[in-house]
Amino acid sequence: MRVTNIYFSKIIKLENRLREFNFRKLPNTENKYHVDVTDDRGQRIMFTMYPDAEHMWHISASEVPQWIYYAQNILGQLIENETSSGVSN
């Protein structure tokens, strides 16, 4: 059995700043992704994203900055685009 590590990075503009989001598919899950990004002070923020039955992506974290919640749909679309293209680093 071969295990494939699926990961990719995307840069998007949020709150007038370019931010690099790193995505990594969690092993042994069908559709969960670990996501991390740095805040304005350089501290890494980590959270998990998963789709619901209607394929809407959600953030699974107790506390993340509001700007990440605002980007939830954008981040979900980035995951969908990347996985549908079949291309990863």
Residue ranges and their predicted role:
Residues M1-N28:
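Negatively charged, low-complexity tracts enriched in Asp/Glu with abundant Ser/Thr
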Residues N5, Q43-N89:
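Acidic, low-complexity intrinsically disordered segments
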Residues Y7-S9, K32-H34, R44:
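Exposed beta-strand and adjacent loop surfaces of beta-rich binding modules
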Residues L18, E30, I79-E82:
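Generic low-complexity, intrinsically disordered sequence content enriched
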Residues R19, R41-R44:
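Short, charged low-complexity linear motifs
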Residues F23, V35-V37, A61:
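Residue-level recognition of conserved beta-strand positions in structured domain cores
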Residues N28-D39:
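Short, surface-exposed, low-complexity cationic segments
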